[in-house]
Amino acid sequence: EKYRKTTFKPKSIWDDNSFLTETGTIELRELGFEKQFDFPKPISLIKQCVELSTSDGDIVLDSFAGSGTTGHAVLKLNKETGVERKFIIVEMEEYAKTLTSERVRRAIKGVPKSSNFKDALGGSFSYFELGPTIEMESILQGKNLPSYEEFARYIFYTATGEEFNEKKINEKTGFI
């Protein structure tokens, strides 16, 4: 009973015009992207979803990031509310580098020529590409052996959870 008094119950139907995909298309254009993506979700829609379902310190996962609206919405919401949410966005298509990550960069830095996105939202992000799969069974059988650097990166990350810097390999000893 006590939780009913402290929680907000959203409307069942969201009919705000700012939630239309047309708005998402206009936003992408203002960010400097021509028609590269059909029916992108608008920032306001994703921002509303994130605001209703997360709080300070939460991590938002979007496994099908598309044009990167989720990352953009989280950055905008963080700036507006002063709350620190993080996000992980995943995109497997070719436009991940040219659209998805570039949109997040522009949101962070701002777009000087845009009237709505001139101001930088701040924040940071890391962009990663998947490398070839390292399967332990194949390694144990001596098949498809990765290079020393690839294997060192895998072992180092598995052991520490940190990114591996190949420059730290001692060429003479092979030690990290």
Identify what each model region corresponds to.
Residues 3, 35, 89, 93-96, ...:
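Generic alpha-helical structural element
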Residues 18-19, 92, 132:
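Residues that form or immediately flank small-molecule/cofactor binding pockets and catalytic motifs
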Residues 37-42, 96, 147, 151:
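Phosphate/oxyanion-binding active-site loops and adjacent basic polyanion-contact surfaces
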